[in-house]
Amino acid sequence: MQTLERIIGEHPFFEGLDHEFMDLVLGCATNVRFGKDTYIFKEGDTANTFYLLRQGNVALEIFAPQRKPIVVATLGEGEILGWSWLLPPYHWKFHAHVLEDTRAIALDGKCLRKKCEENHDLGYEVLKRFAGIVA
């Protein structure tokens, strides 16, 4: 059985993270599972978590009146789900629809924001990694 530290350290988002920072990140992390056809979050909900996807697929959807959901992206193993927790107003911009049973590491955004505010080097490292995704 893999430890949480190893799982996070092997995920592409945190690969190569300094051990000092890893200890801080671990304090905000938990293992989670989501069943097929459930929603991890919905547009407008408060965004306080982000996810390191380990297994499964999740569709990011937007809704328009009188239409079926529009899939704007499908995310899977090794990817990150959610960055709305990082900057105000901390609300999700999409629905996250689970397409197949999914395993992930959930990182508490409030916890990580607090640690980033207390340790600016950690904050810079996290911001650099997210900038590489959204750029």
Q: Model segments located where?
A:
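Cytosolic regulatory regions built on CNB/CRP/Popeye-like sensor folds
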Residues: 1-135
